């Protein structure tokens, strides 16, 4: 079984100020510190404003943590504007699930971070010379409970050498894309 390098990212999308689905930055760092218990290599993309928090994690918990500081909101202003316009179009059409409260419908920064997950993985592969043969994305705030960390402190799985996505719903033969977007239906994750 191959070793797996974990890639993740954390960017301030203002979530602590959201009316719905709000969480503060400290919550995410608590989750990430649990992830850092793993012996796997971890590469994180983030903003320079979080350098003190990452420096503390490196000095106290995970000395081999690799942090790549990249200001994605600055370098992707045009894309953020396009996302914002698309979200406004959806809102104007109406009929969004949960009255349009999910961030997919109104937070362009949320969409951008999710959109860039494959970019972060590829960028880690290109930039880090001692990366493992297998790379996996795990969300920065995924490890909410200690029981999610294996006793061995090593996350392994016998993947073959392909990109893996998980179907969480069967995809129908005929799919109305607009309805899927309006209902925020997720068929694939990975």
Stretch-by-stretch model annotation:
Residues 109-166:
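GT-A fold catalytic core of metal-dependent nucleotide-sugar glycosyltransferases
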Residues 1-27:
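N-proximal low-complexity "stem/linker" segments adjacent to membrane-targeting elements
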Residues 180-190:
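A recurrent flexible, glycine/aromatic-enriched loop bordering the glycosyltransferase active site
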Residues 25-41, 56-57:
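Short, acidic, metal-binding catalytic loop of nucleotide-sugar glycosyltransferases
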Residues 164-177:
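Short beta-strand-to-loop element that shapes/binds the nucleotide-sugar donor at the catalytic cleft/hinge
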Residues 43-47:
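Short internal beta-strands
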Residues 20-32, 118, 149-154:
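Well-ordered, non-membrane alpha-helical segments in soluble/globular domains
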Residues 60-129:
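Active-site-proximal specificity loops/subdomain of glycosyltransferases
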């Amino acid at each position: 079984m191959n070793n797996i390098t974990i890639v993740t990212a954390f960017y301030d999308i203002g979530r602590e100020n959201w009316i719905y689905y709000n969480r503060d930055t400290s919550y995410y760092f608590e989750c990430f510190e649990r992830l850092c218990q793993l012996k796997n290599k971890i590469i994180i993309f983030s903003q320079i404003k979080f350098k003190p928090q990452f420096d503390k994690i490196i000095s106290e918990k995970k000395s081999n943590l690799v942090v790549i500081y990249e200001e994605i909101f600055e370098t992707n202003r045009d894309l953020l504007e396009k996302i914002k316009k698309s979200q406004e179009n959806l809102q104007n059409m109406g009929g969004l699930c949960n009255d349009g409260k999910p961030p997919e419908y109104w937070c362009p920064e949320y969409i951008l971070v999710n959109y860039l997950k494959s970019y972060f993985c590829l960028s880690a592969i290109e930039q880090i010379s001692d990366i493992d043969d297998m790379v996996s994305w795990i969300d920065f705030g995924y490890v909410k409970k200690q029981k999610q960390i294996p006793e061995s402190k090593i996350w392994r799985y016998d993947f073959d050498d392909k990109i893996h996505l998980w179907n969480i719903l069967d995809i129908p033969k005929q799919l109305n894309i607009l309805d899927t977007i309006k209902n925020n239906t997720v068929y694939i994750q990975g």
